[in-house]
Amino acid sequence: MSEEQASSPSAKMGDEEKPVGAGEEKQKEGSKKKNKEGSGDGGRAELNPWPEYINTRLEMYNKLKAEHDSILAEKAEKDSKPIKVTLPDGKQVDAESWKTTPYQIACGISQGLADNTVIAKVNKAVWDLDRPLEEDCTLELLKFEDEEAQAVYWHSSAHIMGEAMERVYGGCLCYGPPIENGFYYDMYLEEGGVSSNDFSSLETLCKKIIKEKQAFERLEVKKETLLEMFKYNKFKCRILNEKVNTPTTTVYRCGPLIDLCRGPHVRHTGKIKTLKIHKNSSTYWEGKSDMETLQRIYGISFPDPKMLKEWEKFQEEAKNRDHRKIGRDQELYFFHELSPGSCFFLPKGAYIYNTLIEFIRSEYRKRGFQEVVTPNIYNSRLWVTSGHWEHYSENMFSFEVEKELFALKPMNCPGHCLMFDHRPRSWRELPLRVADFGVLHRNELSGALTGLTRVRRFQQDDAHIFCAMEQIEDEIKGCLDFLRTVYSIFGFSFKLNLSTRPEKFLGDIEVWNQAEKQLENSLNDFGEKWELNPGDGAFYGPKIDIQIKDAIGRYHQCATIQLDFQLPIRFNLTFVSHDGDDKKKPVIIHRAILGSVERMIAILTENYGGKWPFWLSPRQVMVVPVGPTCDEYAQKVRQQFHNAKFMVDIDLDPGCTLNKKIRNAQLAQYNFILVVGEKEKTSGTVNIRTRDNKVHGERTISETIERLQQLKHSRSKQAEEEF
C-alpha cells in the first residue's frame, strides 16, 4: 500500500488493524524500556533545536506554495465561471468555480453546520472544505458520525501526532493511516525506541499544536521535486519511486510538518477536540521481517471529550474479552514460535472447533451440500490456470518436488473446479453444492500474525455452488437463509451490502446485469435491510458482503457470498443443457458462513467473554462431591455423563471446601455444577446449580442427562435458565 493509499480516508479502514487483536506487533504495547536519550520516567522532551530537515523542508515548501497560490489566483481570475452546486435534498446553490469552497457554502446554510462539518464530499469523493470547487457538482457535508468523516478526522489527527513525533524524536516518518478505531504513525529511529513514558510529553505537544489551529494546506508537486524535498527520508523516497506512478502527487502541511498524502483533511488542527496516545509497538517496514524495524505509536481522537471517556470504557471491556487472554486462561489454545501463525488447539479448544464444524456439517445435510476431501498440495500449473499464481503467489507456500513447482493450497475453489471437470456434467446435476473443510495455508507476513484473527494455517466452512444462470436467485436465497440460521444461534445481528459491477470488470455486461438483478431479488425476498455498494464488486462477479455485530458493538466480516463468472471460463467448465447444448458454462457461487473457523472462534470467544453457551461449551458439567465418602459415587456420575457425550469434569481436591469447589467451577464457567452428597448417593440423584448460582435442585441422573441432551441438541442460548 502506498503512502497515499495507506493514509487515504477512502482506503478501507481496518486493513492495518483488525477489530479483534492488535496487528503487526512484535513488542509489548506501552513498552516500559528506558530510552537511551530519554529522561527517565518523564520520557523525552521536545528537541531544541529541531532537526535541520524540518526547516529545510519548510523553506522549500513555502517557495512552492507561493508559486502555486499565484497560479491559482491567476486561474481563478481567468477561468472562474458560475456553477451549480446540488445539495442532498436536491436544492441548488450558485457558486463560482475556482473560488467558492464547500466551507463557504456550509456557512451560507448555517454557521452551526459549518462548525460541525468534518469534511465535504464532492461528486461522491471526499474533498477538503477549503479547496475551491472546479465545476458543477453534487455536495455533501459530512459530520463525525459518518465513517468517511471519522477516517478523515483520524487521518488529520495522525498528522498532528506525526508533527509531535518529529519534534520529539527527530526520526523519519513512514506510514500514518487512520485505522478501525483511531490512527497510528510509524517512525524510523537510528537509535533508541519509544517508551510509554514519552506519551505525556507527546500529548502535551499535540495539545499545543491543536491550540495553534494550524491550517491543513494541500499542494500538488512534481515527483522529482518531492524526491529532493524528502531526500533525508529513505522511506518517503521508496514510496515515491516504487508506488507513485504519476508525474505529480500531493503533500499536506500543518505547521512545520509536510508529508506525502492524498488527503483530504479537516480545516485546521483546532478541529481535533481531544486526543489520546494509548499504545506503542515495534513493527517492520511494510510488515516484512527482513526490512527495517520501525516504532509505531497509536492514538485516538474525538470531537467531544465524553466520547473519549466512552471509548476508554469500551477498551477496558475489549481488553477483558481478548480471545488470546481467555484462550490462555481457559486452556483452549496457544501458539508457539516453532510454528508461527499455526494454532495449537488443546482438548477443550478442539471441542469448540469440532463442534462448530459438526454444526455446519449437520446443516449441510439438510441443505443439499455434499462434503468432499481434496488435496493440500497442487502443481503450480493449477494456480496458473486459476490466475492465483499471477496475483497471489507471494502469499503461497511453494516448494520444488522432482524439479516441478508445487504449493500448499490457500483456497479450495480451483480444486473444486477439477472435481466438477473430472467427468461430463448434465443440467440434471445442477445446482451442485460442494463443501470442503480442507486445511488451507497462506503465507502471511510474520509481523501481521495476530492471535486467531491472522494466521497461516486455518480451515473454512468453504463451499462452492455450481449452478445455471437462472438458478442464481434460489441459491442465493438458500445461502442467506443458511447464514441467518447460524448467526441467530450465535446471537449475532448482521448487516448486508450488495456490491455491484466495478469499472474494470470482466465478462458480458448483460450477464452482470442479470446476475445483479437476481441478487437484488434474493435480498428483497430475504426480508432483512440491505444497502447497495455500487461499483464495489470483484472484477469477476458481484457479491453480498455480510458483517456480524458482536456483544460490544464491533462489526466483523466472516460470511462470503460471491458470484464468479471467470473461474468457469479459466477452467473451461461446461455442462450439457436440457436442450442438448454441451457448451453451457456454469456460474460458481463462493460461499462461507463461519469463514475461517479460527477467526470465528476468536470472535465467539470475545463475544461471549469466555462464557460459552451450553452446546458449545468445553466445560459443560462439573461433578462436586461433598466429601471423600462420596468420591466413588461422584466418579460413577462423571462416567455416566461422559458416556452421554458431555464435557464433564470432577473436583476431588480434598483441600477445598464444598463452597470453594462450587465457586471455582462457576469462575471456570462450567454451565452446570452437580453436587453429590450422602443423600444423592443413596437416592441415585444429583443436586443441580448453574454457573450463575441458580439452584435447580435434586434430579435423577437419567432425567438430568435427558434434559441436558435436549438443551444441547436445540443449541439453546440460555440453557441454564431453561433447564
From Swiss-Prot:
Compartmental location: Cytoplasm
Domain TGS: 79-143
Residues recorded as bearing Phosphothreonine in the entry: 246, 453
Chemical reaction(s) catalysed: tRNA(Thr) + L-threonine + ATP = L-threonyl-tRNA(Thr) + AMP + diphosphate + H(+)
Residues with PTM Phosphotyrosine: 298
Listed GO biological process terms: threonyl-tRNA aminoacylation
Enzyme class at the top of the EC tree: ligase
Compositionally biased intervals (Polar residues): 1-10
Function according to Swiss-Prot or TrEMBL: Catalyzes the attachment of threonine to tRNA(Thr) in a two-step reaction: threonine is first activated by ATP to form Thr-AMP and then transferred to the acceptor end of tRNA(Thr). Also edits incorrectly charged tRNA(Thr) via its editing domain, at the post-transfer stage.
Name of the featured protein: Threonine--tRNA ligase 1, cytoplasmic
Organism this protein belongs to: Bos taurus (Bovine)
